[in-house]
Amino acid sequence: MDLKSWILLSCTLLPLSVTSYECYVTPCTRDIIIVVDGSSSMQTSTYVSQEINMITKLTYSWTLDDAKVRLALVGAYLGNEFNGLDYFTDSSLIEKRLQSFRLAAMQYGLFSGDFNTTVRFLDERYVGPRATFGPRANVQKRIIIFSAHKGASDIASTKSKLQEFAQLGYAVTIVGIGVSEDVYKGTFYHKFVSVQWFELGVVAQSIIDTITEDGICFLDQGWTTPKQEICTTSTTTTRAPTTTTTVTTVKGVTGKPATTAKPVPPTHPPFPVGDYQDCSCTTQSLYIDIIFVIDVSEGMGQGGLMMVKAEINTLVGQMSLDPNIQKHVQVGLIKYSDKAEVVFKPSDYTNEDEFTEDLWSDPRLEDVDEKSDEVNLHLGLQQAAKMTASMRNGVRKVIVVYAASYNDEGNDDARQIAANIRETGYAIITVAFVEPESSNLVMKIGEIASPRMNFTSFRDDLLVEQMEDALCQVNCYCPNGWKQLVLENRKYGECFFPTKIDASWTASKFECPVLSKEHTGNGHLVYVNSELKNTFLNQFYMDNWYPENQENPNYDIGYYYDQATKKFIWVNGVTNNPYSNWATGHPDVKQGDCVMAKLLKDSKNDFRWNSVSCTSEYGRGLCQEAACDTDFYCAPSSN
């Protein structure tokens, strides 16, 4: 970003004194509403996630205050409903709110909607005479609507209402995603900003600047520049632009690959796998400790070593090592052949570019050890185990082993120390570098790896995507006391917790958000959308059922009959879930509007759904919450 753009951005969000734009106390004050389009017009939940990334970048450095900038975030059609709370005056709440929107899109999918309903919601909740959350007096007002809607008649039907918004002092900017401005010519707005689908993934600074300068920073007609005063600046730390190296294939490498611009996260947005929510995977938001252990014996060869360095460069270059950023990585590096040596300590680097620069320039990593064709991975893992003790407490740790040779006999056998490391709770990733004509013994190194974390390279392509996924698996876990969904050794972004006292369905419904308040605060009675998940939940509940505490192992689920719509719906708003597991004679709303899973007589873990009273039948609730991952941060003390 050039200096002028940075100054203009800072004007509204980190106020400074600039004569060419509004940098004064009064004009720095705004009431801003941002609408996130979560409808099926966005095509996929991945695009919604990228839309949220753009809004995150737009609002990243904003300093909110009740006397200056206030921000309201509206989720349109996320979870098939509208979410709009009062204006935020605490900047720390922005990311949490946006992440709840992301979770809703990823977990429940997209629902059809229209532009007219979005505008009507804004009128009823924020703009109209009976608005729940009205604006402040004598404050310039802005609405930024992100929209992928394409219905010309639907959009044109909002013209009179948006004209009313303008008359009330609201300047509306439409950020059209994947649509041309011609589609919106039939309505009324202050500014239209066009964003193509591919631009969502790169978040061009020019788009952010246009929204900021033309949609927020400008002075309304009739507002005059007041006496010049320097606005109070924020203490927010903004990360300086960095670069990284991107390599996908290395053949005949002789030096450091060319440096290219750091890719904008997310590198691999989360997406549902089957009936389950996958863990999110934004490499730049990883919060783990990593130790690379590299085989530099003769078997690795110079070409193999160059490939290993290129892969590490690509991975670390996309992470953050800056301790001033909440979600950052610590990295250490050890080399080994017949002996082991620490090359980089975790405390050596707080900048990923410095790490990758030294990765290529440090003389200890320039050549393989041609004097030794022996390997002692046991010593390498010993050094790695010692290094973990110097790293952060409570942070997930992983040891990544790159090996071209392997010895599982005598004192060189690394299997026992690897088992000890895994039992401590640390993960081990192995990458076997195999020459086509060489022995496959090195592929046996996979026996020391954590489940699903053993990989093989035939020295033709890097394994960046597989490695990113494995690192994100390390970064995916549940808050203390919650059970993670794990299928075939694959972790998913869903966590479960049974309430501890008998209570009504209604009481359990309100208890779940309370139990999750230290994490996302979006806990809810469990959503059951497949036979596989139903089986997992039934077994989990039985594993945690104690007859002395609960006579019958029955649990409430997040399903109920809505008297207004005369339909069964889930507490998360889903109405079109095809899966059900009713007991014989159910549902029966005469017995109640809420749903409890009850164990069948003489069965060990076979439950069926029963209609029960929402207030008078008592049982335990089974709560569901998002996992800690690259989207949802858990402090180390929560690990």
Curated annotation (Swiss-Prot):
Organism: Caenorhabditis elegans
Matches recorded under Gene3D superfamilies: Mannose-Binding Protein A, subunit A, von Willebrand factor, type A domain
GO molecular function, one term: carbohydrate binding
Domain of life of the organism encoding this protein: Eukaryota
Record domain VWFA: where: 31-178, 289-474
InterPro entries: C-type_lectin-like, C-type_lectin-like/link_sf, CTDL_fold, VWF_A, vWFA_dom_sf
Statement: the UniProt record of this protein carries the keyword Mitochondrion: no
Keyword vocabulary terms for this entry: Disulfide bond, Lectin, Repeat, Secreted, Signal
UniProt name for this protein: C-type lectin domain-containing protein 160
Upper classification of the organism: Eukaryota, Metazoa, Ecdysozoa, Nematoda, Chromadorea
